[in-house]
């Protein structure tokens, strides 16, 4: 069983949301537009993701950023969880 007090569970949901959108958009500027934040905010998020997961996350390839295999796999796993969290926060409370 997972230790719920583990420091590895200290996740920033916004950071995970940035990861998902970065993998989808493959562009810092389009990610910033979609999330209604500045490009420096997205760049700072990339830096935090790289440090947190010890992975380049995105690698420049011409005009776009290509996700690493780890970033792609993480985004694919995280996206449905983020959707569910959003749905839970939108449900009426009774």
Question: Residue ranges of each PLM-predicted region?
Answer:
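Short, Lys/Arg-enriched N-terminal segment that forms or immediately precedes the first helix
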Residues: 1-7
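The N-cap/first-turn positions of alpha helices
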Residues: 12-15, 39, 71, 78, ...
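Short alpha-helical "packing" element that flanks the helix-turn-helix/winged-helix DNA-binding module
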Residues: 15-22, 74
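Helix-turn-helix DNA-binding elements, focusing on the entry/boundary residues of the two helices
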Residues: 27-28, 46, 60
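A short LG(V/I)-centered, amphipathic sequence patch enriched
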Residues: 50-67
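Alpha-helical linker/hinge and terminal dimerization helices associated
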Residues: 52-53, 74-94
């Amino acid at each position: 069983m997972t230790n719920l007090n583990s420091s590895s569970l200290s996740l920033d949901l916004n950071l995970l949301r940035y990861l998902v959108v970065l993998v989808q958009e493959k562009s810092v500027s389009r990610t910033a537009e979609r999330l209604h934040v500045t490009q420096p905010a997205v760049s700072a998020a990339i830096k935090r993701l790289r440090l947190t997961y010890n992975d380049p996350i995105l690698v420049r390839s011409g005009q776009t950023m290509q996700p690493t295999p780890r970033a792609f796999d993480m985004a694919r796993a995280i996206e449905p969880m983020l959707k569910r969290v959003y749905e839970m926060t939108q449900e009426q409370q009774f």
